[in-house]
């Protein structure tokens, strides 16, 4: 069976690893993952949404650090964009880590369009770092 698993967000990825293992043990041949929001690159400084003590606990940021070290932190916007080489590289790395056959994130523009709220009326800090 080929499965498409959709989640509202991927924060640290710890629960997904166990879920993917369970799906394969239960007979899945492929597990494809889609996130309804963009990669979380920054811990929430307003509501503590991500419950992370450090940005490096966030799966996307941790992956960037593993791929490129401190140099990668200057290119977070590229990593958050699946149409760039850095973005594709991050997706491949997360797939390998968590056992996905494919991974896709909603873009920030796509998210804003889907919810119908103007960019200037919603906080996007955890995705873009913009205050």
Model-flagged regions — what are they?
Residues 1-131:
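PRPP-associated nucleotide enzymes
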């Amino acid at each position: 069976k080929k499965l498409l698993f959709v989640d509202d967000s991927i924060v640290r990825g710890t629960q997904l690893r166990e879920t993917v293992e369970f799906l394969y043990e239960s007979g899945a041949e492929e597990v494809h993952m889609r996130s309804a929001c963009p990669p979380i690159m920054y811990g929430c400084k307003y509501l503590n949404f991500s419950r992370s003590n450090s940005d490096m606990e966030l799966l996307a940021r941790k992956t960037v650090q593993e791929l490129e070290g401190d140099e990668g932190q200057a290119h977070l916007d590229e990593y958050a964009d699946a149409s760039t080489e850095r973005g594709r590289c991050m997706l491949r790395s997360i797939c390998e880590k968590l056992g996905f056959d494919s991974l896709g994130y909603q873009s920030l523009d796509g998210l804003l369009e889907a919810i119908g709220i103007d960019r200037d009326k919603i906080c996007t800090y955890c995705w873009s770092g913009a205050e």
